[in-house]
A protein has these predicted regions:
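Short, positively charged
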Residues: 1-65, 69-73, 79-246
Length: 246
């Protein structure tokens, strides 16, 4: 069972609880048994947390949010199979190198071809991965803000976890956390940011810490074209609890 299937199943659980239509093609990517196991807690989550009811599912095509709620509010839904862990933002969280650098070109005018020429590097995935590492570490506050917007730019955020056990079976005891009213932008203090790797020692993964709290992980895949960043949700909860987000 992969993470995408669990995430889509969580969306289906919400949609089916409140009779919101989901396209058959999208529905086929979920798992009915997982959706049913999550459905048990959905209504209580919405009621206890006073979340407006969903009226439209819009998660297809990498939309940054998953549901339109009553009063035109928005809801994003994420999940982990087991304990709270790493989750990628939409659109820019796990793109190919082509998509990533096209995004940088559109948003910031960063030209990957010009940068490769400046560094006298061939246009290969390995070279692009190196530029990704350099750009991420040199512009971490800016990129963190981008990742934050594509992850939390919503009125309500639900995160389901403890859905499956370590053998891939249903726990029948899914858990959920809810966040709302998060800042649209976060002022990241560069003095509080650290990495577990340097550009030169970074092979595949590089953990990002804020005030010594692990809040995310960069990953450069060796066997496929993917430049990934995922937030550590447990770490984000610690930042919120300690009032380190502003």
């Amino acid at each position: 069972m992969n993470n995408e299937t669990v995430g889509i199943s969580a969306e289906l659980a919400i949609a089916d609880t409140f009779d919101v239509e989901v396209s058959p093609i999208y529905r086929d990517r979920g798992d009915e048994d997982i959706a049913d196991s999550i459905s048990v807690i959905v209504e209580n989550v919405f009621e206890q947390l006073n979340i407006p009811l969903p009226v439209e599912h819009i998660a297809e095509n990498q939309n940054p949010v998953d549901f339109i709620l009553e009063n035109e509010q928005t809801l994003s839904v994420k999940s982990n199979q087991q304990r709270l862990g790493l989750v990628a933002p939409q659109v820019i969280g796990q793109p190919t190198s082509e998509t990533y650098f096209s995004f940088l070109q559109d948003e910031f005018g960063f030209d990957i071809n010009r940068e490769l020429r400046r560094l006298r590097l061939p246009d290969t995935y390995e070279s692009r991965a190196y530029v990704f590492k350099c750009f991420s570490m040199d512009n971490i506050c800016m990129m963190l803000d981008v990742y934050w917007q594509y992850m939390f730019h919503c009125d309500h955020y639900l995160h389901f976890y403890n859905v499956l056990d370590r053998f891939g079976g249903l726990t029948n005891n899914p858990q959920c956390i809810a966040l709302k009213n998060l800042p649209k932008h976060v002022h990241w203090d560069p003095n509080l940011i650290s990495f577990t790797q340097t550009v030169n020692t970074w092979s595949e993964c590089n953990t990002l810490r804020y005030n010594r709290i692990s809040i995310g992980q960069f990953q450069v895949h060796r066997n496929r074209n993917c430049l990934k960043f995922r937030f550590n949700i447990a770490g984000i909860l610690k930042l919120i609890d300690r009032e380190l987000l502003s």
